[in-house]
C-alpha cells in the first residue's frame, strides 16, 4: 500500500479515471486533507468523471497545476463516495483549504444548476 504523501502539499491534483474501454481521462481537481491522511475532492453527479467513478473507482492522482500540468509522480488510489457526516467533513476540509473556490463558488454553481454535489475520499492502493 502506498501513501498520499507526495500530493499532500498540492492544492490541485490531476485525477485520472478510466473509460469502459480502459483508456485514461485526466482532470485537475482541488484536493484537501482532514488533518490526517484522508484526502478529499468533490464533483457533481452529472460530471463524466462521476459516471466513470461509478463504474471503476480505481484512479491515479498526481500533483499538478490548476490547469492540469503534472508536477510530480502519480499514485494509484481508489475513490470512495462519501455520504452523510463523512461528506460534510469533506466539504468542510475543502472549504478550509480553498476558501473562495470550494467554500463559495463551487457550491453556488452546483445549487444554481441544480446539481447534486458528490464528495469522494482518495485512499491509496
What are these regions (language model features)?
Residues 46-119:
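Short, structured beta-strand-loop surface elements
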